[in-house]
Regions:
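Primarily extracellular surface-attachment and macromolecule-engagement regions
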Residues: 1-2, 96
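N-terminal pre-triad scaffold of radical SAM enzymes
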Residues: 3-52, 63-76
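Conserved Radical SAM active-site core
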Residues: 40-155
Length: 155
């Protein structure tokens, strides 16, 4: 599963204290989106000016602390993130297996007070439907309360 953000939230994304997973990818491009970094299914290259190094881009897209995104658009290999492990440039999401998600949830189960549990949100959660469904089934087997936030336009 492609997850671009995760963390605990109390009663905003469902009842009680919840572990919220923001899933990468959305089929809409709403101008008011609270999580625009989660829109593109393939992810977005994120830059941190405090840590960026010009030398990680062989195409000259980085000058000082600025990134010329017009150069990035044509880049196929993204050497800045595939060949360099740096805080300066990174992909907007991390990959997790369903089992890794379930293990993390079970390790944090004591935090689900006041009817809490897990919420999957986005992006649009149904863009990763198979992984989402498998996660929901496995969490239900462990009696974890689940919720999804969806725009209801994808499936």
């Amino acid at each position: 599963m492609k997850i671009f953000q995760k963390g605990f939230n109390y009663s905003q994304d469902g009842d009680g204290n919840r572990l919220v997973y923001h899933m990468q990818g959305c089929n809409l491009k709403c101008p008011w989106c609270a999580n625009p970094e989660g829109m593109q299914c393939k992810g977005t290259i994120v830059s941190d000016p405090e840590w960026i190094l010009e030398s990680i881009c062989p195409h000259g897209a980085i000058s000082g602390t600025k990134v010329d995104r017009t150069i990035c658009v044509g880049c196929k290999n993204h050497e800045c993130i595939t060949e360099h492990d740096t805080k300066g440039m990174y992909l907007s999401y991390q990959n997790y297996t369903v089992d890794e998600i379930v293990e993390e949830v079970l390790n944090n189960e004591m935090m689900f007070y006041d009817g809490g549990g897990v919420t999957f949100t986005g992006g649009e959660v149904t863009m990763q439907f198979e992984e989402l469904l498998e996660s929901l089934k496995k969490l239900k087997e462990h009696r974890i309360t689940t919720a999804i936030e969806t725009n209801e336009t994808h499936i």
